[in-house]
């Protein structure tokens, strides 16, 4: 039989209001009364109803998490960092997969609000104008991790993609590359815009230009990388910058199948540095994003908003580095 708050109150010989105050951490309870109620709660194995507690305290200690593709290892590493910090601060996560579908994202966002979550966090992906509007009108705090929504008013955690692209491009030029391709995702996000800007900046410094026919997009998957290489093959560049590890590996394998030598004929750098980069041969050169930290810092930033703590900087930029492995010279 389910133990109720009434059972605890009767056993402890206090009012249900007193039990509720103890359960919700209200300090206006005498220590001896609190101890007695907690002893009864433990003995009866009473489990407070989370929804009822939320109605009483106006908090549910739950956060909504929206992930574009839960099967993608990039997002799973972000989620791991987020979940560890959520647990540390005693929050529970409701994780929803949006399939990179803006309409589904809106539906999930509104559904999470109806569940009275205390906050929402987006992990990577695209922040559409409609979602941005929902975020700005949201009754609960929202943070985006792994993207920044092209809006300084939205709290975010990310790396400096422009700087990373500049560093990668400069390195490749020093290794002899003169023609470049940029492979992005099918949706425009600020990270991709920043990579494009960084690439063009360095190319212009060396009197080089990006051929528009070599700026391609796909869905960030391995198969997309294979299809992308088919488009590149007739006008093969010296180097490719790839937003996604999976895309980059698809290009690598297709190049090898076509007899293209990597890195002698084609150099490749990706921007995710998931565990996949060390599972291929040659190992993939990649911009190292601190994925766990991006998720963790995003969750910590959200807890600050939810608990009305002071926010020094709502747009956090974490350090990156580039690991040059076997796909670059």
Curated annotation (Swiss-Prot):
GO terms for molecular function: DNA-binding transcription factor activity; transcription cis-regulatory region binding. Residues 1-57 form the HTH lacI-type domain. Keywords: Activator, DNA-binding, Repressor, Transcription, Transcription regulation. It holds the Pfam family Peripla_BP_3. Residues 5-24 bind DNA. Global transcriptional regulator of carbon catabolite repression (CCR) and carbon catabolite activation (CCA), which ensures optimal energy usage under diverse conditions. This is Catabolite control protein A. It comes from Staphylococcus epidermidis (strain ATCC 35984 / DSM 28319 / BCRC 17069 / CCUG 31568 / BM 3577 / RP62A). The gene is ccpA.
């Amino acid at each position: 039989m389910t133990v109720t708050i009434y059972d605890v109150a009767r056993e402890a010989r206090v009012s249900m209001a007193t039990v509720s105050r103890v359960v919700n951490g209200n300090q206006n309870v005498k220590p001896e009364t609190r101890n007695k109620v907690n002893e009864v709660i433990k003995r009866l194995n009473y489990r407070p109803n989370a929804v009822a507690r939320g109605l009483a305290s106006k908090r549910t200690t739950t956060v909504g998490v929206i992930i574009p593709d839960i099967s993608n290892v990039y997002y799973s590493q972000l989620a791991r960092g987020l979940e560890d910090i959520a647990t540390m601060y005693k929050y529970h996560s409701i994780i929803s997969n949006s399939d990179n579908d803006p309409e589904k994202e809106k539906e999930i966002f509104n559904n999470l609000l109806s569940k009275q979550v205390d906050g929402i966090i987006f992990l990577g992906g695209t922040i559409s104008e409609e979602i941005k509007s929902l975020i700005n009108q949201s009754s609960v705090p929202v943070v985006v991790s792994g993207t920044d929504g092209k809006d300084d008013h939205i709290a975010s955690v990310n790396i400096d993609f422009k700087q990373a692209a500049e560093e990668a491009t400069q390195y490749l030029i020093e290794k002899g590359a003169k023609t470049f391709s940029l492979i992005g995702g099918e949706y425009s996000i600020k990270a991709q815009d920043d990579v494009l800007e960084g690439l063009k900046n360095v190319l212009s410094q060396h009197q080089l230009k990006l051929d528009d026919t070599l700026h391609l997009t796909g869905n960030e998957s391995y198969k997309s990388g294979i299809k992308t290489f088919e488009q590149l093959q007739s006008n093969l560049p010296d180097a490719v910058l790839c937003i996604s590890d999976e895309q980059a590996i698809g290009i690598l394998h297709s190049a090898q199948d076509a007899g293209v030598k990597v890195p002698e004929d084609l150099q490749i750098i990706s921007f995710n540095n998931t565990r996949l980069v060390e599972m291929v041969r040659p190992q993939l050169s990649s911009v190292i994003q601190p994925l766990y930290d991006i998720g963790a810092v995003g969750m910590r930033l959200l807890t600050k908003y939810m608990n009305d703590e002071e926010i020094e900087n709502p747009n956090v930029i974490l350090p990156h580095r580039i690991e040059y492995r076997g796909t670059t010279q």
